[in-house]
Regions:
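Conserved AdoMet/S-adenosylmethionine-binding subsite of the radical SAM
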Residues: 92-232
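Binuclear metal-ion centers of metallo-dependent hydrolases, dominated by the metallo-beta-lactamase
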Residues: 235-257
């Protein structure tokens, strides 16, 4: 069963990577809006979840977030992180930069020790206002599943223009103020082998990671049901092997099995 998240606030949930996380979903509550259509997405395929509701407004997000933070301040739990995630790509929201400003102000008011994180597929980092907003937050988590141009079109299935070289250059512009997040998996999709744990995929990806020089790398594998049922988790051993190669570059890495 794939997951469509409430909007604009959900949780808190316990994140494998981030701790007690209050979710901020800038997409409609009844469907998906994303510039990727990943075959492993827990929210399902884009075509199966076309939203009829509008995007939440900046004002709706701010009001709902403040109400939830006030309640958590009174009744708990204390969040470790406020995470922009949900049903698609958060930076696709036209008021994303302003919503980040609101969120940072509310965080400082209610839970100044909490981090603000954004999980992004990196497709809008070339937009100056999006870039500036991401540069202000604590955890600018950017997806780079592969540097193979053919593989990315089967795994992540970008819905518009997508150039891996442009994405890498955009990530480099953060000058280390980013975290690279990469999905490793196995199995097949429509008869095509999808294993990206081999040297064929890992070594070029690792070169790109070194070029980007992020402050951290997060590698993970499938945790929830995927829309395609022929995909499989990467093994603990495979993830540990990839993690060790990252550590050898001097870049910190976290692994979610």
């Amino acid at each position: 069963m794939t997951v469509i998240y409430p909007s604009p606030i959900f949780g808190p949930v316990h994140s494998r990577r981030l701790g007690v996380s209050l979710g901020i979903n800038l997409l409609p509550a009844d469907g998906k809006v994303c510039t990727f259509d990943c075959i492993y997405c827990e929210c399902g395929f884009n075509a199966d979840h076309r939203p009829k509701q509008p995007l939440p407004t900046r004002e709706e997000v701010r009001s709902a977030l403040e109400a939830r933070l006030w309640d958590m301040q009174q009744n708990g739990p204390t969040p470790d992180v406020l995470t922009f995630a949900g049903n698609g790509e958060p930076t696709a929201h036209p008021r994303f930069p302003e919503i980040i400003e609101d969120t940072l102000a509310l965080r400082d008011k209610y839970f100044p020790n909490a981090k603000v994180s954004v999980l992004s597929n990196s497709t809008f980092i070339h937009r100056p206002a999006v870039f500036e907003a991401l540069n202000k937050i604590d955890n600018n988590i950017l997806k780079l599943d592969t540097v193979d141009e053919e593989y990315v079109r089967v795994l992540d299935r970008p819905t518009g223009h997508y150039s891996i070289r442009e994405i890498i250059e955009g990530m480099k512009a953060f000058k280390g103020n980013c975290i690279i997040q990469t999905m490793f998996l196995k199995g097949s999709y429509k008869g095509q082998d999808m294993d990206n744990t081999s040297d064929k995929f890992v070594l070029p990806w690792l070169e790109a990671v070194k070029e980007i020089a992020p402050r951290q790398v997060m590698i993970y594998t499938i945790d929830r049901e995927t829309p395609d049922h022929d995909l499989q988790k990467a093994t603990r051993e495979e993830l540990d092997c990839i993690a060790e190669r990252i550590r050898e570059t001097g870049i910190p890495v976290s692994v979610s099995y």
